[in-house]
Structures are given as structure tokens and as C-alpha cells.
Amino acid sequence: MAGARTPEYESIWTDLQGVAFEQGYLDAGGVRTRYLHAGSAELPTLVLLHGSGGHAEAYVRNLATHAEHFSTWAIDMLGHGYTGRPGHPLEITHYVAHLTAFLDAIGAEKVCLSGESLGGWVAARAAVDHPGRVDRLVLNTAGGSQADPEVMRRILTLSMAAAAEPTWETVRARIRWLMADKSKGYDDIVASRQRIYRQPGFVDAMRDIMALQDPVIRARNLLGAEDYGRITAPTLVLWTSDDPTADVAEGRRIASMIPGARFELMTGCGHWPQYEDAKTFDALHLGFLLEGRDA
């Protein structure tokens, strides 16, 4: 068809091509922990936390811009990706303990924390329990504020199906659920996640990750108004127009409970705004993280 444009192929490597970055592993409290790192160690530290069933590749489109200003770490969280699995149901306290062990391992006393979905839940709890270690906080379509049975069932069903039978179709269904634009294939992200889910024992690992979709376990891990009210770090709550886990009103409600929190809305994005519209995300994210710092 005349004038038709061939869609630009999207890949993790083209996102990282030309970026001075490192992939590696370190010991965080006895847990072999995978990371992606970019930026000078002399810069302030920024740690990026992905969502349930995810991995560090969630942030491949953000490393280059953030590395100009921060020693930037995207990690595979406890029990996720290629990081060690403890072999028990995972609750927020377990993730926070692993996160603080990671900060100790890289020698970072105080950091900027930015988390998406589950990562935002963990980051918020870390800011409550360890206020001296969190300089600034970003909650990106963060979980942990409510228990929506339908959303919980959807996450559990899609995630367990992808882990039990990691075919192209089941893994792609899990990835597309995150995104506002369902027309794209997201092939490289699908392939990366498929390889993770094909690891021996990953069905059991996914069961442990999905513990927070159990109503009883989730209830004892939720953050309430009192918890959010104890956050002292400057906070950005970033939400999207098409988030599949919670509407914009929930994002605004979270922001209203955190003293002095800023709220920003990105349109045309789902649950991965840092990937779906990296340019807009980076501008908002860095604008907040760098506010008041020397140029």
C-alpha cells in the first residue's frame, strides 16, 4: 500500500546501543542479585524497581538519560528475573530487606528510589521503614494501596499461565496487558521474559511472587493512610491514563496521603510509562529528581 510505513523494530539492544552500562551480579545479604548499572559511581545513587513478575529490562529505555546525573541501578528484585529465589512466599518485608541489603552491597547510604507497580509498593514501604536511606521517592503506577479482586485475579491468571507454559502467546499476553498500545508485538521484551520464565523451577518462583495476590497476605502488606503519612522524602506519584491496575483517582488518592507529594499524569500509557513513552517519563522523572540540585 502506497505510503504505508513499516513499523520501527524495537529491541532491548537498540535501546542500550551506545550506552556505557554494565550487567552483573552481586551478593545482597546472601542473595545473588542481578543488576544493570550505568553512570559514574561519583554521582548520587538512583535505584529502579520493576513490577510483579518483571525484571531489570523494564528500564532499558531510561538508563542513558539517568546515567548523566545518577549512578543508576536497575535490579532484578528478590525471586525475580535471574536474582536468587528464597523458596517461600514473598511479602513486602522480604523485598525491603533484600533492597536494603543491596544498598549496603553497593555502599549507598542514601538513594533516590523509583518503583513501578510492585516496585513502587516496595519503595514506599522502604521510605516508611528506613526514612534515612531515601532521598527522593517516585511511585510509578504503584501497588500497595488497595485490593481490587478483579485486578488481582487477572494478574494471577496471566502470570501463572505464562510461567506454567511460557509460550510466545502466553508471555505476550502478559506483556500486552501492561501496555496501552495492544497493537505492538513487544517481541524483544517477550523473548527476554520468556527466557526468564523457562528457567527450571520458575513455576514455583512465580507462585511465591504471586503471594501478594492472596487476599489475606495482601491485606497485611497494604499501606494505609498512616503509613503514607509517615513518608518524609519528597515524593512524586506518577500515574497514567490507561493503567490496568487502578484508575487515575487512586493515584491522586495516594498522592493526597503523602505530605507534600507531587502528582503527574501521563496520557496514552498503561502500566509501563517509563517504556511506553520514555521521553515524557524521563522529562518528568528527572525534573523531579534533579529539582533543587546543583547543575
Task: Label each residue range with its predicted role.
Residues 31, 36-82:
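Conserved HGGG/HGGXW glycine-rich cap/lid loop of the alpha/beta-hydrolase fold
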